[in-house]
From Swiss-Prot:
Protein name in UniProt: Polypeptide N-acetylgalactosaminyltransferase 1
EC number per UniProt: 2.4.1.41
Function summary: Catalyzes the initial reaction in O-linked oligosaccharide biosynthesis, the transfer of an N-acetyl-D-galactosamine residue to a serine or threonine residue on the protein receptor. Has a broad spectrum of substrates such as apomucin-, MUC5AC-, MUC1- and MUC2-derived peptides.
Species whose genome carries this gene: Homo sapiens (Human)
Region Catalytic subdomain A, annotated ranges: 115-225
Length: 559
């Protein structure tokens, strides 16, 4: 009997433990599901920890999000709110996993322990909750904790309620100090960044846009370069986050920043001279003439010494070239650190409006940078964009004084030493219209792109698309495109200038007024009846239709 009672006790105890195990298993399974929902939702109280292994949810490891057919119409409506696929963004975890897109040589680099601390300044205006918080979480989760002094979120007068108290409540619970600073009125990126920089405390200031994702190892190589030389300003490689699917695509380490005649920032291939300077080691930083401006790190004291941003500029536009010129001309160095990768949502259109329109604002900002930093080379810009000369660009005396105080070099030095492959030719025979003697029409790039035919149109004398440079290298150039003929009788197309002469070599005879294409031995001619909007190229015959006047454009009110 005693033995039977003992067996019953053992069985009962075992049954209790089995039931308890089943309960715990079910409980934690449900908790995991709840956590997953919290990660993907809107405001949540829990702090999201770094992802240790790839999840299987939408967008994990940077994969594209596919929206079901039945949700396509709703997706299109939501797209208009921020000019990116908001539905896709809200499906993705705030701490999603990303691939390690660094070069193999970058993954084994070792950095000093005593790197400077940084304050990360992020300006936002009516930003989506998911993209803003994904930016914040990527900074926290993929940065050594002791290197992040704080994150400063600068609200440029947002109107959306969830960016008010809910945002403040959320960031208070994060394991890195996050401060929300409010601009009293819509001030624009430039002044909002200045506000964020002024309240920040880190030894380095890192500026990011509000729709970024930092990848593993992004911060250390940036801070290491600044520790090596505090006058070095550094940018990560900017990877592309699709505005349509939020797919994460690695950017190239073989491009760097430049600009065209209209002072638009452009990406161009890293020249061979820069590859030679680095002895072919692609893990070494690239010296870049300009930066895109959205993402960079700079020593706090150096930022003050070189004049921060030009506070006379409005909203955004041109500030990236202005600070790029200033860094180089005033003794600093600007680099793209190829071992640092940060993703950025590139939008095809801006969702924001500005008083007076973006064109007027950018014209004012570009006029200020041209007047202060470009010396006589501002002529190129004004001839291409004559409307700029009519804008009120304010008082620039303090910025001119800054240039003198810092003993900055002339813009010609910048072109010769930092950007010798600039689209601005330093030596040329003419800059202006190329007019046909018989028809009185002018060559016109028609705002066409590379590989398209050059046009011809009635001369309007307003510069812009009818400005061509006949360079000392005997190229006929419009911005970074050169007139190119690859076969007899044309067509005459616009291709990237390669400086190798060949199909882009033209001989102008100032007596006969002919433009002879050297390779084909044919002459530029007026348009044909078959195509009245493009010039032709034919055997030279001395006719008036093959005579061209190369006229320099001047703007007496400026020069």
């Amino acid at each position: 009997m005693r033995k039977f009672a003992y067996c019953k006790v053992v069985l009962a105890t075992s049954l209790i433990w089995v039931l308890l195990d089943m309960f715990l298993l079910l409980y934690f399974s449900e908790c995991n599901k709840c956590d997953e929902k919290k990660e993907r939702g809107l405001p949540a109280g829990d702090v999201l920890e770094p992802v240790q292994k790839p999840h299987e949810g939408p967008g994990e490891m940077g994969k594209p999000v596919v929206i079901p057919k039945e949700d396509q119409e709703k997706m299109k409506e939501m797209f208009k709110i921020n000019q990116f696929n908001l539905m896709a963004s809200e499906m993705i975890a705030l701490n999603r996993s990303l691939p390690d897109v660094r070069l193999e040589g970058c993954k084994t680099k070792v950095y000093p322990d005593n790197l400077p601390t940084t304050s990360v300044v992020i300006v936002f205006h009516n930003e989506a909750w998911s993209t803003l918080l994904r930016t914040v979480h990527s900074v926290i989760n993929r940065s050594p904790r002791h290197m992040i002094e704080e994150i400063v979120l600068v609200d440029d007068a947002s109107e959306r309620d969830f960016l008010k108290r809910p945002l403040e409540s959320y960031v208070k619970k994060l394991k890195v100090p996050v401060h929300v600073i409010r601009m009293e009125q819509r001030s624009g990126l430039i002044r909002a960044r200045l506000k964020g920089a002024a309240v920040s405390k880190g030894q380095v200031i890192t500026f990011l846009d509000a729709h970024c994702e930092c990848t593993v190892g992004w911060l250390e190589p940036l801070l290491a370069r600044i520790k090596h030389d505090r006058r070095t300003v550094v940018c990560p490689i900017i990877d592309v986050i699709s505005d349509d699917t939020f797919e994460y695509m690695a950017g190239s380490d073989m491009t760097y920043g430049g600009f065209n005649w209209k002072l638009n920032f452009r990406w161009y291939p890293v020249p061979q001279r820069e590859m030679d300077r680095r002895k072919g080691d692609r893990t070494l930083p690239v010296r870049t003439p300009t930066m895109a401006g959205g993402l960079f790190s700079i020593d706090r004291d150096y930022f003050q010494e070189i004049g921060t941003y030009d506070a006379g500029m409005d909203i955004w536009g041109g500030e990236n070239l202005e600070i790029s010129f200033r860094i180089w001309q005033c003794g600093g160095t600007l680099e793209i650190v190829t071992c640092s990768h940060v993703g950025h949502v590139f939008r095809k259109a801006t969702p924001y409006t500005f008083p007076g329109g973006t064109g007027q604002i950018i014209n004012k900002n570009n006029r200020r940078l041209a007047e202060v930093w470009m010396d006589e080379f501002k002529n190129f810009f004004y001839i291409i964009s004559p409307g700029v000369t009519k804008v009120d660009y304010g008082d620039i005396s303090s910025r001119v004084g800054l240039r003198h105080k810092l003993q900055c070099k002339p813009f010609s030095w910048y072109l010769e030493n930092i950007y010798p492959d600039s689209q601005i030719p330093r030596h040329y025979f003419s800059l202006g219209e190329i007019r046909n003697v018989e028809t009185n029409q002018c060559l016109d790039n028609m705002a066409r792109k590379e590989n398209e035919k050059v046009g011809i149109f009635n001369c309007h004398g307003m510069g812009g698309n009818q400005v061509f440079s006949y360079t000392a290298n005997k190229e006929i150039r419009t911005d970074d495109l050169c007139l190119d003929v690859s076969k007899l009788n044309g067509p005459v197309t616009m291709l990237k200038c390669h400086h190798l002469k060949g199909n882009q070599l033209w001989e102008y005879d100032p007596v006969k007024l002919t433009l002879q294409h050297v390779n084909s031995n044919q002459c530029l001619d007026k348009a044909t009846e078959e195509d009245s909007q493009v010039p032709s190229i034919r055997d030279c015959n001395g006719s008036r239709s093959q005579q061209w006047l190369l006229r320099n454009v001047t703007l007496p009110e400026i020069f």
